Amino acid sequence: MEGLGNTACSLECLACLNHVHGWTIWGGYGTLPLKPRFLVASDRSQVARRRVRLDLGDLGIIEQQLNQSSNQLGSQAFAQL
């Protein structure tokens, strides 16, 4: 498990708060001090990016996730050379 930490920060709309091993947490609307305590699973065989956007208007959380195999990415890059 990878933790995003306890970093407190003032945010502008959708400003990036923290970035750990390709995992990104985004702040909500307005300038607010946030202390993220999200835990995310990390699979070393994949390149994974996850964006968690806090919509403070309705307190909803919108998540988008993109996973790609690191072997697939490596073979595509090699083929382009």
UniProtKB/Swiss-Prot annotation:
Keywords: Plasmid. It comes from the Bacteria. This is Uncharacterized 8.8 kDa protein in aacA4 3'region. The lineage of its organism: Bacteria, Pseudomonadati, Pseudomonadota, Gammaproteobacteria, Enterobacterales.
